[in-house]
Amino acid sequence: MSTNNCTFKDRCVSILCCKFCKQVLSSRGMKAVLLADTDIDLYSTDIPPTNTVDFIGRCYFTGIHKCKLKDIACLKCGNIVGYHVIVPCSSCLLSCNNGHFWMFHSQAVYGINRLDSTGVNFLLWGNLPETEECTDEEMLEISAEEYIR
């Protein structure tokens, strides 16, 4: 995976929520663009969401790139919210990318920018622990301030 000359450390960390049922899907989201079509906005995360989404349907390949994908659906409402890049193609691996393989459609999720430990500034990817994982209870305890922003 190529991240040379690419930096994502100044991007805000977002809590990703399903637009259909408001379920929190991930606490480690990042705004991104589709490598195959940079006009398409989406969100991505680096850690598989736990107990919030599951695979649905069969694997498929994209038309432009040869990545192997599988759709993911919200476990609460059942709507498709994105996809997982099961096998990225060499073109995507060699391009500037953030290393995230869990993608969320901007039409299906919304992001809430997380605050850092001061509660004043937005949390940035450069300050986020690589192995941070939240339990379901922790994700549900989102402060009112984070919802307002």
From Swiss-Prot:
Highest taxon listed in the record's lineage: Eukaryota
Membrane spanning stretches: none
Subcellular location field: Cytoplasm; Mitochondrion
GO biological process: positive regulation of apoptotic process
Tissues where the protein occurs: Expressed at high levels in stomach and also in kidney and, at low levels, in heart (at protein level). In the stomach, highly expressed in foveolar cells, parietal cells and chief cells (at protein level). In kidney, expressed in endothelial cells, mesangial and epithelial cells (parietal and visceral epithelium) around glomerulus (at protein level).
Entry keyword set: Cytoplasm, Mitochondrion
Similarity-based family: Belongs to the FAM72 family.
Biological role: May play a role in the regulation of cellular reactive oxygen species metabolism. May participate in cell growth regulation.
PANTHER family, sorted: PROTEIN FAM72A-RELATED (PTHR31841:SF1)
Record's subunit section: Interacts with UNG.
Entry protein name: Protein FAM72A
